[in-house]
């Protein structure tokens, strides 16, 4: 049978020929659903269609949906690599009917595909139905000709699907394939159904009810939702019982074997499979805008990456491996998912950086793991407290600890680990549960369905006329907004830009006969409904009211300059740093711009200067900024940059600016729906303020343009001139003069520290005799005041040199009355006295607690510096005890 790519295509083509719309996979980060960590099923992008709050221009659809299950309820991570069918990343093939065909056509389409198109033997197929679904039972007999013995009624929830406690629901019918009696396992519904003989290949969900509190009603327009795992059906069609034996997975595993020189069918087979699976989820998540971090989706990605990297080390990889596998994945899957082609450089850089960091973590963590587990035998339990220490101190995830111990037959004490982790787990849940795109209020679905999209005029004009189509206040439609009221207005057309793509929404004024309102902000709902946040200042705003619309021109002009500048900076960053640079977010406001991009380390001063110079070169050329509409595939194919994870329509706006000196092509070409200047010279000037880190592998550039940049530069110039006047030098000499002053200050501080040290050594400071003997041990006690805390250790070291053998204690009283204490023990007495124990005795007298350091040098402090002498005396008593 054909390869995985051909099987995917044949599924989609079959349903297209049968009247279905081919819909692209949605991103792995769900849209409009803050409760879901990752897209984990084909129906996720159609959730609002099934519930009736969203309408699509088609009633039948077919998709190949990329999915991840590695966190929360749907978590396959721990099993991946050790079974034939578990994955973190998988593709879900599905056909959908939104109130169109129902059970009879769904069963007919499914049966014809698998038996006629794919030629699966009919006598190896069986179906399950919900126990009271007589209609589906009879259809399987009629359409497929299945005998009663191969139609199984299932009474459990396995064959009844519900979206939640309320909403659409209905019975399921699953198609199973019988691999033969040479494989253990029984049919579905039997005691040994979990065996590998009977494998589910397709699930058909018949959404025919609506669950309400206390009752279940028939839906007026029943729907169909189906799901078939591409990996599972590909294995079957390619004659194997193992998903990892398909051509796609074999290609990745073969590359792992080539790079590690470890056979993929030997004792370390599981490691090859973990790496192959986790490579897919890692690259696809990065392509959809997720980067490794310590919270939310980024933390799940980091766990996936690091689990794969741990197995790379088990295969003997001495250098980072994962990034070297990206090309084979792009070669195998890039045609079906062009986003991973665009993200190849970023994914490669991210994997290399993460594996480099993790190898340092592994070295520290594995050392402790081996030390703590050295005496354990098979069947023993590894202390949960130590597992938590590995996690908390060394960044060593629990699943890696369990993975490392599994081969030796050792389990982790999960109870103790879970108790220690309770707080962190609660925080992690809070971090991601609301981290998705905010859910859209239901009211806007109704407005969108009734009024359609808002016509946006703002690319060509900042003034227009429009009519009120809807008014919304506190989540509900209203008929009017009186003077003093605040609410949302939807117009038939508008010049006001709605907040999107990082660009802030427009503000301005709307007015009509007897009515005026300030537009405070403009947003976009459902992609194309422009919503104006207004405060009525005169009269009453009503449905149908004709209005004159005027954008705040000065504010829009400043926003345009900043948005165009982000495009120039984006391309300049790529020219200076490399092709791995990709936009990760932005803020385009009237007073500033902020641009987040992928890069593993801070920019040097020279790199920042180069980026700024390149951007200003194109500003000074004052070249035209061109925009045109193109088909999205043509735009991307032409080289226009797209934002990873962004959802584009069939037609997109392409913004080009500048001319590359080398080849005459446009300097910057991006897909962008924002507003821009007419010529690059309208930006005025670009001034980069700062580069900072916002997450692992993500940097942030902040900059100003036009008037804001000029004011900033003027302020900086004024400050420089004022400083020059204070120093009595020219502005050109300020840097050298300040450097000289800083060095002079450092020298004075060093001289002062040396003077204090000599004073302390000279006569024991304020405490009288410097050295005494306590039970044969020399004890040097020094009480001083006003010393820099960082000088105390130097004084102790000097004291240890002076006495040769013994104990030195220095107590300092600061200007605020607090006390600091440092205790040192010479090397020859290391086995007799512990500086940490001695310092704790003195710190307690100062009113403090604890103290830290090493057995030969420790420090601590307390609020009562007046008791410095008493603290030194307490240490003396301890030496004599």
From Swiss-Prot:
One of its GO terms (molecular function) is ATP binding. Zn(2+) binds at residues 563, 567, 672, 676. SUPFAM superfamilies: Class II aaRS and biotin synthetases (SSF55681), Putative anticodon-binding domain of alanyl-tRNA synthetase (AlaRS) (SSF101353), ThrRS/AlaRS common domain (SSF55186), Translation proteins (SSF50447). InterPro entries: aa-tRNA-synth_II/BPL/LPL (IPR045864), Ala-tRNA-lgiase_IIc (IPR002318), Ala-tRNA-ligase_IIc_anticod-bd (IPR018162), Ala-tRNA-synth_IIc_core (IPR018165), Ala-tRNA-synth_IIc_N (IPR018164), Ala-tRNA_ligase (IPR050058), Ala_tRNA_ligase_euk/bac (IPR023033), DHHA1_dom (IPR003156). Binds 1 zinc ion per subunit. Its cofactor is Zn(2+). Consists of three domains; the N-terminal catalytic domain, the editing domain and the C-terminal C-Ala domain. The editing domain removes incorrectly charged amino acids, while the C-Ala domain, along with tRNA(Ala), serves as a bridge to cooperatively bring together the editing and aminoacylation centers thus stimulating deacylation of misacylated tRNAs. This is Alanine--tRNA ligase. It comes from Azorhizobium caulinodans (strain ATCC 43989 / DSM 5975 / JCM 20966 / LMG 6465 / NBRC 14845 / NCIMB 13405 / ORS 571).
């Amino acid at each position: 049978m054909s390869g995985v790519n051909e099987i995917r295509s044949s599924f989609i083509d079959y349903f297209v020929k049968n009247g279905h719309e081919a819909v692209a996979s949605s991103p792995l980060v769900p849209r409009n659903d803050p409760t879901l960590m990752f897209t984990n099923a084909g129906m996720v992008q159609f959730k609002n269609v099934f519930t009736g709050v969203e309408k699509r221009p088609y009633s039948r659809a077919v998709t190949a949906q990329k999915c991840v299950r590695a966190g929360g309820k749907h978590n396959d991570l721990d099993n991946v690599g050790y079974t034939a069918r578990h994955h973190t990343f998988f593709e879900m093939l599905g056909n959908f009917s939104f109130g169109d065909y129902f059970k009879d056509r769904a069963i007919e389409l499914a049966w014809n595909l698998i038996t006629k198109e794919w030629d699966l033997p009919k006598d190896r197929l069986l179906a399950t139905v919900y126990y009271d679904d007589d209609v589906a039972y009879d259809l399987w007999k009629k359409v497929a000709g299945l005998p009663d013995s191969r139609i199984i009624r299932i009474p459990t929830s396995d064959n009844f699907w519900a979206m939640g406690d309320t909403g659409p629901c209905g019975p399921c019918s699953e198609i199973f394939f019988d691999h033969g009696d040479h494989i253990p396992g029984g049919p579905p519904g039997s005691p040994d159904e979990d065996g590998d003989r009977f494998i589910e290949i397709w699930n058909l969900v018949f959404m025919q009810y609506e669950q309400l509190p206390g009752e279940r009603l028939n839906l007026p327009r029943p729907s169909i939702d189906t799901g078939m795992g591409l990996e599972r059906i590909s294995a079957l069609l390619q004659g194997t019982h193992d998903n990892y034996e398909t051509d796609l997975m074999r290609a990745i595993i073969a590359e792992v074997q080539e790079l590690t020189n470890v056979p993929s069918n030997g004792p370390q087979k599981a490691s090859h499979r973990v790496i192959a699976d986790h490579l897919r989820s890692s690259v696809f998540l990065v392509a959809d805008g997720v980067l490794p971090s310590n919270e939310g989706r980024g933390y799940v990605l980091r766990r996936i990456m690091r689990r794969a990297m741990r197995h790379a080390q088990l295969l003997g990889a001495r250098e980072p491996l994962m990034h070297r596998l990206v090309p084979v994945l792009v070669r195998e899957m890039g045609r079906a998912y062009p986003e991973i082609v665009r993200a190849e450089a970023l994914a490669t850089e991210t994997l290399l950086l993460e594996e480099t960091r993790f190898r340092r973590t592994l070295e520290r963590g594995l050392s402790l793991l081996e030390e703590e587990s050295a005496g354990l035998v098979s069947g023993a339990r590894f202390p949960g407290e130590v597992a938590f220490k590995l996690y908390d101190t060394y960044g060593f995830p629990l699943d890696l600890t369990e993975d490392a111990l599994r081969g030796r037959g050792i389990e982790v004490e999960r109870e103790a680990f879970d108790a220690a982790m309770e707080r962190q787990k609660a925080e992690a849940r809070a971090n991601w549960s609301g981290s998705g795109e905010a859910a859209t209020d239901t009211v806007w679905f109704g407005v969108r369905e009734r009024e359609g999209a808002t016509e946006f005029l703002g690319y060509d004009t900042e003034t227009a006329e429009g009519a009120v189509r809807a008014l919304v206040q506190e989540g509900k439609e209203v008929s009017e907004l009186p003077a003093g009221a605040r609410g949302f207005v939807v117009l038939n057309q508008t010049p006001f830009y709605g907040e999107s793509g990082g660009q802030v929404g427009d503000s301005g004024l709307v007015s009509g006969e007897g009515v005026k309102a300030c537009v405070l902000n403009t947003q976009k709902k459902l992609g194309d409904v422009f919503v104006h946040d207004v405060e009525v200042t005169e009269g009453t705003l009503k449905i149908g009211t004709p209005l004159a619309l005027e954008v705040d021109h000065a504010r829009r002009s400043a926003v345009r300059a900043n948005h165009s500048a982000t495009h120039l900076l984006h391309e300049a960053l790529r020219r200076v740093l490399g092709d791995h640079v990709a936009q990760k977010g932005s803020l385009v406001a009237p007073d500033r711009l902020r641009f987040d991009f992928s890069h593993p380390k801070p920019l040097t001063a020279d790199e920042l200067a180069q980026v700024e110079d390149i951007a200003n070169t194109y500003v000074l050329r004052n070249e035209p900024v061109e925009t045109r509409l193109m088909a999205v595939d043509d735009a991307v194919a032409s080289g226009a940059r797209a934002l990873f994870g962004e959802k584009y329509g069939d037609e997109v706006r392409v913004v080009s600016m500048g001319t590359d000196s080398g080849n005459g092509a446009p300097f910057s070409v991006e897909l962008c729906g924002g507003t821009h200047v007419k010529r690059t010279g309208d930006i005025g000037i670009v001034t980069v303020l700062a580069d900072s880190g916002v997450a692992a592998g993500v940097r942030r550039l902040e900059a100003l343009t036009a008037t804001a940049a000029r004011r900033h530069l003027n302020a900086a110039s004024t400050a420089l001139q004022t400083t020059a006047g204070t120093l009595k030098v020219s502005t050109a000499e300020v840097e050298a003069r300040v450097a000289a002053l800083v060095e002079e200050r450092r020298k004075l501080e060093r001289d002062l520290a040396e003077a204090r040290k000599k004073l302390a050594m000279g006569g024991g400071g304020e405490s009288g005799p410097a050295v005494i003997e306590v039970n044969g041990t020399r004890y040097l006690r020094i009480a001083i005041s006003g010393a820099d805390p960082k000088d105390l250790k130097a004084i102790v070291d000097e004291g240890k040199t002076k006495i040769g053998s013994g104990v030195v204690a220095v107590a300092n009283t600061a200007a605020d009355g607090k006390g600091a204490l440092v205790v040192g023990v010479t090397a020859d007495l290391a086995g007799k006295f512990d500086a940490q124990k001695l310092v704790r005795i003195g710190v307690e007298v100062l009113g403090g607690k604890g103290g830290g350091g090493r057995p030969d040098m420790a420090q601590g402090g307390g609020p009562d510096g007046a008791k410095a002498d008493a603290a030194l005396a307490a240490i003396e008593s301890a030496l004599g005890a």
